[in-house]
């Protein structure tokens, strides 16, 4: 018996900068040549990223993040669960340190600052919805865009589905 397609088969997930995905069928696997993707500077000094997959309709985001020694992610909230696997170096916050080969996850609603250790860091971050950063009385995403405008609708869909 063939399985029926999931209602999620129409997700709008993409890997930016991966032109080889343009003509794939909707349910085909997307193989990402990570080394061919460019590092993109973030608005935070010493932090660069590669977006591996993002779905603006659901908020799903997986990224590779490279942090220079001491580079800092300022005050931010994990709107939903965030997961981080450290590949090299370390990621530190007021609660502890996550070193190479270690994994940390943070529950929805947790809020903190984080910074790279003396060797810097390379990590994979997996987000159900991107973090909300608090800057100058504004709530923005990692790119500095108004969080509500960028991700509010995806968050509302998630909450509606959760309580439906």
Where are these regions (language model features)?
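Short acidic-glycine-tyrosine-enriched beta hairpin
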Residues: 92-116
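Conserved short histidine dyad/triad with adjacent acidic residue
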Residues: 46-77, 107-111
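Short intrinsically disordered coil segments
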Residues: 67, 80-82, 138-145
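A short, N-terminal "cap"/entry segment at the start of jelly-roll beta-barrel domains
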Residues: 2-58, 139-164
């Amino acid at each position: 018996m063939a399985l029926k397609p999931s209602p999620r088969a129409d997700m709008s997930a993409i890997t930016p900068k991966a032109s080889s995905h343009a003509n794939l069928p909707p349910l085909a696997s997307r193989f990402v040549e990570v080394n061919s993707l460019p590092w993109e500077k973030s608005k935070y000094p010493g932090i660069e990223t590669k977006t591996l997959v993002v779905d603006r309709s659901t908020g799903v985001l997986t990224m590779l993040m490279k942090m220079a020694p001491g580079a800092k992610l300022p005050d931010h909230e994990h709107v939903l669960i965030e997961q981080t696997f450290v590949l090299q170096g370390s990621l530190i916050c007021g609660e502890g340190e996550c070193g190479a080969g270690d994994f940390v996850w943070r529950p929805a609603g947790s809020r903190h600052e984080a910074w790279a250790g003396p060797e810097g860091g390379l990590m994979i971050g997996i987000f159900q919805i991107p973090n909300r950063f608090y800057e100058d009385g504004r709530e923005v995403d990692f790119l500095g865009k108004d969080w509500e405008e960028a991700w509010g609708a995806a968050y509302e869909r998630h909450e509606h589905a959760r309580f439906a």
